[in-house]
Amino acid sequence: MALLGPFRKNTQVEMSLTDTRKLGIPSVIRQSGDIEGTPGCILSGPYGDIEIPKGVIVAKRHIHMTPDESLALHIKDNDEVFVLTKSYGRALIYADVVVRVHRNYHLAMHVDTDEANAFNSDTEPYGVIVRFFDSNFNTDKWIEDELSGIRR
């Protein structure tokens, strides 16, 4: 387990879907910091246990970028984009990637271990950010529409 900052008002534990399933914890995909209605857990270490009543999440995949980068890409904070990746026989299109904009960020995409392992690359991975629809686009709704015969 890694301990990461910044320090927050409430303790948060980010896990992969695989880990939540192994531990029998409900998988709740959320943006970092959005912990209302999430399960808790007991954290055990060499100096004892800490029980947190909420805060276990599977972090929603996201991109950090600066305001200048967001302006250049015509993307706003909390927009959702697609990221097309290239790898050796396992290229992926990541959907529903939330963009987080802040002056202290630098351009980087954050995915969990499961998502990183699905991408096969022995070099530094890279991707192309694409917006197919408006900032309020929802992939789940698109799939439901397609299955219902509604074509966009």
Describe the residue ranges of each PLM region.
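Long hydrophobic alpha-helical segments typical of transmembrane helices together
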Residues: 110-152
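Short terminal or interdomain "cap/linker" segment that borders an active site or interface and mediates
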Residues: 94-96
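Short, charged beta-turn/beta-strand-edge "cap" motif at the junction between a beta-strand
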Residues: 49, 87-91, 133-136
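Short beta-strand-centered segments at strand-helix junctions
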Residues: 1-46, 51-78, 84, 98-126
